[in-house]
Amino acid sequence: MAETDIAMPESTPVDSRPAFAIVEELKTKFGENFYVQTTCEEFPTVWVERSRVQEVLMFLRKVDRPYVMLFDLSAMDERLRVHRDGLPASDFTVFYHLLSLERNSDIRIKVALNESDLNIPTATNIWPNANWYEREAYDMFGINFEGHPMLRRILLPTYWEGHPLRKEYSARATEYTPYMQNQAKQDFEQEHLRFVPEDWGLKRGNADEDFMFLNLGPNHPSAHGAFRVVLQLDGEEVKDCVPDIGYHHRGVEKMAERQTWHSFIPYTDRVDYLGGCAQNMPYVMAVEQLAGIKVPERAQVIRVMLNELFRINNHLLFCGTAIQDAGGMTPVFYMFADRQKVYDIVEAITGYRMHPAWFRIGGTAHDLPNNWHKLVKELLEWMPKRLNEYHTAALKNSVFIGRTRNVAQYDAKSALAWGVTGTGLRATGIDFDVRKYRPYSGYENFDFDVPLEYEGDAYARVMVHFREITESLKIIQQCLDNMPSGPYKADHPLAVPPPKDKTLQDIETLITHFLSVSWGPVMPAGEASFMTEVVKGASTYYLTSDKSTMSYRTRIRTPTFTHLQQMPSVINGSLVSDLIIYLATIDVVMADVDR
């Protein structure tokens, strides 16, 4: 063991669950010096010595039935964590969340670091999408990934001071002196914004010619949000490009440390502001996993129905704007009219439209209203006819096909290497849909197909989105036909807010209700995460509780952060016009990327 490595506790007993078989494979290959952490999850969390982490990661990448995807990578400041009995000593912990499609299982690898030595080898030579994840961990925690090709800030400006997800970094504006802007500070910030190609890893030219550099964004209609792409051009050809993100960053993971488990729910709506209730799902289910709450069947089906309504709304907007960016102006206006019908249902059920924040820990905010089924029936009768019109008039249009066929194309191997999930992965022929692979909230009881395309181009991505609308309608029809009776919220002391009907009957229930609503519930110490298929791909909330009313660490893995990172590998060598089509068909919302 290297001098800077941190000793492991004694090995833990073998777990017989299938997902834990990989632990024995690791021990066979590397010996017994691993520590398997107990969590609330159905897959192993294994602590590894820093000196062996690259070997272990490479083994997992190449093992039989390999862990082909680096699903997430981040860190945690453990210095103020109280309830970590038995865990290896660690000031900062770096973790790698890996996914195996063949095993249909995950593994989390953890590495303990001492505050005085925050160096760890890069994983970019194993998974290319480690690039942005490591830059984010450097930006937020100050972790130094040795061998990284361009370790610089990614979400914050280069002149930013400090690392915001460290515990000494204040979370409230009231803890800072008032912000003052003067000419010297303005000049300093502007100078740091000066474009220097070498800072971005770009060459100014070659022996024969100079390249032109062009900023697409940060305010460009085809960027679908505030972000910039620095283009290195030779005429119309894109020689190289570098996405520049962070314009929407608002520190949502830091906010989670100062909100109660319940009061953080509205923030989840706004990670992907088009996802609505679907964005609540991974968070509340992770909290329920942590608390051991079993959600009633009626609440599960209601959640599924709301999820699919927001999936339809997202996909209608996606298809309309994709066609618009390819030159077809009319369909997007019709699709916006259809989206209003969905929003009418959402508003009737939740009281709000885009940001309902309606799911609760243990169920939903309230029951379905009277005559809810009438609006749903109208949508189910209306949408199939409209979809037929869109398919005939727009998606079979020769101009649209010409602009999207064989454009911005990538294969399944590339998609997995870059961590692509959702429709972008299914457009390459891989049928990974969390609702099917790992059913949750009763999805195993629904009959629906997973649409696939195989070309991996822009047209394939549009068609997968479009066909998924039909499948969502099928699921909603089954919700309508088979809505269970019963409660809409779990009768559990940690469900929030707790049932109010008994508060007038005995003082103990009244006190519990008061504490839960005012201070928030105290969740058991431990770790939990939950993966769901949100509207843009697979999303996970990884929660660490230190037995408090607030989360100690909330890690939000969003799908589009890694989708956007794939851009140079797809677009380099193409035309600028192809970049526009690419951006139109990867379904990116910048709030989801930047968090």
From Swiss-Prot:
It is a peripheral membrane protein. GO terms for cellular component: NADH dehydrogenase complex; plasma membrane. Residues 210-595 are annotated as: NADH dehydrogenase I subunit D. Keywords: Cell inner membrane, Cell membrane, Membrane, Multifunctional enzyme, NAD, Quinone, Translocase, Transport, Ubiquinone. GO terms for molecular function: NAD binding; NADH dehydrogenase (ubiquinone) activity; NADH:ubiquinone reductase (non-electrogenic) activity; quinone binding. It is found in: Cell inner membrane. SUPFAM superfamilies: HydB/Nqo4-like, Nqo5-like. The keyword RNA-binding does not apply. Residues 1-186 are annotated as: NADH dehydrogenase I subunit C. Its EC number is 7.1.1.-. It comes from the Bacteria. InterPro entries: NADH_DH_suC, NADH_DH_suCD, NADH_Q_OxRdtase_suD, NADH_quin_OxRdtase_su_C/D-like, NADH_UbQ_OxRdtase_30kDa_su, NADH_UbQ_OxRdtase_49kDa_CS, NADH_UbQ_OxRdtase_CS, NDH1_su_D/H. It is an enzyme of class 7 (translocase). It catalyses: a quinone + NADH + 5 H(+)(in) = a quinol + NAD(+) + 4 H(+)(out). Its main location: membrane. NDH-1 shuttles electrons from NADH, via FMN and iron-sulfur (Fe-S) centers, to quinones in the respiratory chain. The immediate electron acceptor for the enzyme in this species is believed to be ubiquinone. Couples the redox reaction to proton translocation (for every two electrons transferred, four hydrogen ions are translocated across the cytoplasmic membrane), and thus conserves the redox energy in a proton gradient. NDH-1 is composed of 13 different subunits. Subunits NuoB, CD, E, F, and G constitute the peripheral sector of the complex. In the N-terminal section; belongs to the complex I 30 kDa subunit family. This is NADH-quinone oxidoreductase subunit C/D. It comes from Acinetobacter baylyi (strain ATCC 33305 / BD413 / ADP1). The gene is nuoC.
